[in-house]
Amino acid sequence: MIDDRLKSLIKYIDSEDLVIDIGCDHALIDIYLIKNNILNNIIISDISINALNQGILNIKKNKLDNKIDARCGNGLEVLNEFDNINTILISGMGTNTILKILDNKYLNKINKLIIQSNKDYYLLRKEVIKLGFMISDEEVIVSNNKMYINIVFVRGNKKYTDIELKYGISNMKNKKIYYEYLINKYQNILLSMQDKDKYTELQNEINILKELMK
């Protein structure tokens, strides 16, 4: 059974996608994708042999050994020249780790990135766009009192404003939840802030967020 956090990623995966799931979370979403006939097969990878072994146990319980190819290793490094992958799925990792994973020559073969992170979205958007991608979808997810943002990148070139890189594209789903969280966070910081310049800067960010919510 997969939780709402993982389930929120499924709609971004199409039947023609050839997927590697990096950091495979016990293969839960991968089993779901196969059993529900969304994908015919998938490669999963995890740098932790213990986590991967748990995934392999789940795969065997569901008799999907011939559909889910489990490999232990660091991100895209598990792929070889014979693998025909065009889509990367990454969830439950920090932005710096994600960017290290994407720093790989195999990325040239990738057309779609489905990424779920819980921090450093500005850095994530800015750096992935530099790699030749543009944002096609964004959605705010709250699961077990934690907030995540799903960002789907596809190949393409598009210019974004600094506000879009910081706070997301205009049609980001459930953005009000995220903006309200940030406004409350910034307002609490202002209560104890002594630096006038930083106070003004943060107040400006709050005003921007309030405008984005309209």
Regions found by a protein language model. Give the residues of each.
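S-adenosyl-L-methionine
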Residues: 1-16, 31-32, 53-82
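Class I S-adenosyl-L-methionine
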Residues: 2-5, 86-87, 96-214
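Glycine-rich helix-loop-beta junction characteristic of Rossmann-like nucleotide cofactor-binding loops
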Residues: 9-15, 78-82, 107
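Conserved S-adenosyl-L-methionine
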Residues: 22-23
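Glycine-rich SAM-binding Motif I of class I
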Residues: 27
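Conserved SAM-binding motif I beta-strand of class I
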Residues: 41-46
